[in-house]
Structure formats: structure tokens, C-alpha cells
Regions:
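Active-site regions of metal-assisted phosphoester/phosphodiester hydrolases
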Residues: 8-10, 16-21, 25-204
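Active-site neighborhood of divalent metal-dependent phosphoester/pyrophosphate hydrolases
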Residues: 1-9
Length: 204
């Protein structure tokens, strides 16, 4: 599970609370914004151990702080387990800002050394107003969108595809869609996206 702007404030550690409630014991959290009594930031929850964790600062100049949280895990697909790279991105509000942030991420050490067939899941609040970031920046380097372009904001009447899930390497997408339950519309001003993935077992 990947969360953006997850709070840790007023003595409530939501990352740990969600970890316990969902039975996902492995947690990585980086507070993009720190306050006197807490803050909020990117979070990855997993049933499997997380390693090789990197945080990349994507802040442009004096704009609001943004970042990427990346971790490596071993996921079971049937009788086999494979390494999967998980990347949680939160991009800025301005179009030029988002482009610069993606270029910085794609040129960064945690990412640029990965083989194209290495399974990668990249997801988050991309603030992608028009759904163009994938075709412009991610698909040229081998990513594909998990499922159709989906409107996720605002949650109660979605009109913008701000959020997205992209995959690269030996991964196949079975489905990717937002849950339609009322609680999903109440939990956040963005609808969540849920993807079901398989591994192409003929990979290295």
C-alpha cells in the first residue's frame, strides 16, 4: 500500500496504526513536512520485508516540498518469489514543476541503474491534471499505465485523473480501478486506486 500526505501528528502515528489494523508489519515512512507536533509524508506498507529504502527530494526551488519514497521487496507469485521495486511519488501542482520532478527522479541513482526488466511499481498523487505525464515521461522509458486513465479527484465527483499507477518490467496488470464504496469517498479527497498484478514467470 502506498500513501501520500499520511499524517503523523497529535501523537497519532497513522502509519503504525494502519500497519497494525491491516496486518502489514513492514512500514517505511518519510515526513515531507515536519511540524512542532508531527507532520505528514509518503508511506509504504507491505506484508513482505522492505529493504534498500531511498528517499529522493523532488522539491523545486521554494515550492511546496515533494518527494519520492522507493523500496525493494520480495513478493510471492504462486510458488516463486521475485524482487519488486516500489516507488511512491508525490508531485507538484504546476505543470513545469511536475515535468522537472519526473526528470529528476528518472535520472536519479536509485532508479537509473535498474534493468528495464526489473519489476517496478510506480504510483502516487502525480497531480496529473490532463493525464499526460505517462505518455510524455514514463512510457518512453518503458512504463505502462496499470489500467485505463481514471479520474480520481475530487473523490465525491471525480473529474481529474490526478493519481496513477504505472508498471515496468516483468509485471502483468490483471485489473486497476478505484473502489466504489462510500468509505473510499470519505477517507480522502482523492479516490484510491487498487491494482492486481501478476509476474511473467519467464523473466530472469
Amino acid at each position: 500500500l502506498l500513501f501520500d500526505e499520511l499524517p503523523r501528528s497529535h501523537f497519532h502515528d497513522q502509519a503504525e496504526m494502519l500497519s497494525e489494523a491491516l496486518g502489514m508489519r513492514h512500514v517505511e515512512y518519510f515526513p515531507q513536512h515536519r511540524f512542532r507536533q508531527g507532520g505528514y509524508g509518503n508511506c509504504i506498507l507491505s506484508r513482505w520485508p522492505l529493504s534498500n529504502v531511498h528517499h529522493l527530494d523532488l522539491t523545486i526551488g521554494t515550492r511546496k516540498k515533494r518527494g519520492a519514497l522507493q523500496a525493494r521487496t520480495r513478493v510471492r507469485f504462486g510458488q516463486q518469489s521475485r524482487t519488486v521495486i516500489l516507488t511512491n511519488l508525490h508531485l507538484g501542482l504546476a505543470g513545469t514543476e511536475r515535468g522537472s520532478q519526473l526528470e529528476r527522479f528518472l535520472g536519479s541513482d536509485p532508479f537509473k541503474g535498474l534493468h528495464r526488466r526489473t519489476p517496478i511499481v510506480l504510483a502516487g498523487d502525480l497531480n496529473d491534471l490532463w493525464g499526460t505525464l505517462g505518455p510524455r515521461f514514463l512510457m518512453p522509458v518503458g512504463f505502462s499505465r496499470a489500467g485505463p486513465l481514471t479520474r480520481t479527484f475530487p473523490a465525491w465527483v471525480p473529474i481529474r485523473p490526478l493519481d496513477g499507477i504505472f508498471v515496468r518490467g516483468d509485471l502483468r496488470v490483471r485489473r486497476c480501478e478505484p473502489p466504489l464504496e462510500t468509505v473510499a469517498k470519505r477517507a480522502s479527497d482523492h479516490l484510491p486506486l487498487v491494482a492486481e498484478l501478476d509476474h511473467a514467470m519467464d523473466g530472469p
